[in-house]
Amino acid sequence: MLAKRIVPCLDVKDGCVVKGVQFRNHEIVGDIVPLAARYAAEGADELVFYDITASAHDRVVDKSWVSRVAEQIDIPFCVAGGIKTIGQARELLAFGADKISVNSPALSDPSLISRLQDEFGRQCIVIGIDSFYDAASDSYKVKQFTGDEAATKETAWYTQDWVEEVQKRGCGEIVLNVMNQDGVRGGYDIKQLSLVRQLCDVPLIASGGAGTMAHFRDVFIEAKVDAALAASVFHKAIINIGELKQYLAAEGIAIRQ
């Protein structure tokens, strides 16, 4: 059995790490490099950085802090934000990123996934999906440009269909960002993640809702995800990553120590 992964997420805006609730009202929580170094020292398996306004503002993630992060940590990290071309992806990888993640640009141009996969290999390409549960229709829908409230829009894609589409086009991993749960620390959306798990032949990372150590245990056992991503519980020091891993190991979950 492959060991499960713990992945802190750092949302970046204007050069700082920020955190919102349900993708709104972002507040500054710290500086990029010190937080990255702290999480690496605590035992994070990898890090994910989202430049949350890059796509909405038609720019690409700032490479200067990518290189500074690469100099300071010795664990893999993934970068996302406005990546629309092979050249932009190549630059970020050259500056030290191990993976690149694409979200809104892939919705605008799904062929981007295949082109990136052809150039860099499936293992390097992560697709982020911002999924919103619409109670009126009892369905999961994909949203785009979620880093900017004014630019956010609903797409024509249902989450399950988009999960299948991105796999056909060659993604190596999927991060399912459950918007309804984001930042509220009420637990991961086990129902939705379990549904996506059945459709997902590539590694699946759960995102949105972590509030206690038990929430991590539950998502690994019940939804059978490969990794759990979280932000506010780590930023606010509610959960220490090393202690979380000890807890999960004691619960019988294969986890990297």
From Swiss-Prot:
Gene Ontology MF, one: lyase activity
Annotated pathway: Amino-acid biosynthesis; L-histidine biosynthesis; L-histidine from 5-phospho-alpha-D-ribose 1-diphosphate: step 5/9
GO biological process annotation, one example: L-histidine biosynthetic process
Family matches, as HAMAP family: HisF
Gene3D superfamilies: Aldolase class I
Active site: 11, 130
Organism: Shewanella sp. (strain MR-4)
Enzyme class: lyase
EC annotation from Swiss-Prot or TrEMBL: 4.3.2.10
Quaternary structure note: Heterodimer of HisH and HisF.
Entry protein name: Imidazole glycerol phosphate synthase subunit HisF
